[in-house]
């Protein structure tokens, strides 16, 4: 029974979230009122199941809950504000209508997800290559445990830099706003499952989707070990750009080791100290260029 749960929870979690969001968006419910309770319900579910069957027992409890929840709320508000800004721009700027709106709604959402996902991957990858971007992105890597809230732990400026390109492109090509909102909600739930402390197994799905088994390698404390698996939803980008990595033998025998930032053992632990940290400190893992 445990093994069945481990292999089925990811597809059940994501498919049910996907179709719940699609159904609510098509039902005429306010797009923001539709996604907030869905994200909250799946967040609560992720919290409960990862505490019931943890991958790493040392990650079950921590002192970072309030900090990470603050990041989640702040960054969600940034997303909503950005979308309202883009809606306002769309009213005043006659963007071309190139997006295939004749497709079924669920296919439109998958297409928008793919567009947004590529730019998330690309900016994330560059954030490990250039020092000025890394200083912002280091906030995400400062956690010393992985659990469902880590997915949205980003510096506010990095949140804007990482999310804007894909969303702006969607706007420019005429993607309907409900499609973008649905795509972002589904992505948020996948990020929960990507960072969760739940001991689940994705099986063949990890060849296609960015699951926890892959993303945990990305959070290893040693800089040289963490330059892998940048994707947020699809693994295809990591495979194309040769940044994909997996080692099941070591994963299941030795684990992934410590996570965090080895070069920064005294990283600030409050929101505002972390907010200002990139602007006045020389953060570890400097640019290689």
Where do the PLM segments sit?
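Short, hydrophobic transmembrane alpha-helix segments
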Residues: 20-33
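Membrane-embedded catalytic scaffold of the fatty acid hydroxylase/desaturase
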Residues: 70-257
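Hydrophobic alpha-helical transmembrane segments of polytopic
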Residues: 35, 39-42, 113, 183
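N-terminal membrane topogenic signal
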Residues: 1-12
């Amino acid at each position: 029974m445990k093994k069945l749960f481990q292999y089925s929870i990811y597809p059940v979690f994501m498919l049910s979230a996907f179709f719940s969001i699609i159904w609510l968006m098509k039902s005429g419910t306010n797009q923001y009122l539709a996604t907030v309770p869905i994200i909250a319900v799946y967040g609560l579910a992720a919290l409960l199941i990862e505490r019931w069957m943890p991958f790493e027992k040392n990650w079950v409890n921590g002192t970072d809950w309030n900090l990470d929840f603050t990041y989640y709320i702040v960054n969600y508000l940034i997303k909503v504000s950005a979308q309202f800004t883009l809606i306002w721009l769309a009213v005043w700027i006659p963007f071309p209508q190139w997006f295939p709106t004749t497709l079924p709604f669920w296919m439109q959402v998958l297409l928008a997800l793919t567009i947004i996902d590529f730019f998330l991957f690309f900016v994330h990858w560059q954030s490990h290559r250039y020092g000025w971007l890394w200083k912002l992105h280091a906030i995400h890597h400062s956690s010393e445990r992985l659990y469902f809230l880590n997915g949205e732990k980003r510096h506010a400026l990095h949140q804007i830099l990482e999310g804007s390109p894909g969303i702006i492109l969607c706007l420019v090509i005429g993607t309907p706003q409900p499609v973008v909102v649905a795509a972002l909600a589904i992505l948020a739930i996948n990020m929960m499952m990507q960072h969760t402390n739940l001991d689940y197994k994705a099986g063949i799905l990890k060849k296609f989707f960015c699951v926890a088994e892959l993303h945990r390698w990305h959070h290893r404390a040693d800089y040289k070990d963490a330059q892998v698996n940048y994707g947020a939803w699809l693994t295809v980008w990591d495979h194309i750009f040769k940044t994909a990595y997996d080692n099941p033998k070591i994963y299941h025998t030795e684990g992934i080791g410590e996570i965090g930032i080895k070069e920064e053992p005294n990283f600030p632990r409050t929101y505002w100290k972390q907010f200002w940290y990139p602007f006045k400190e020389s953060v570890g893992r400097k640019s290689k260029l």
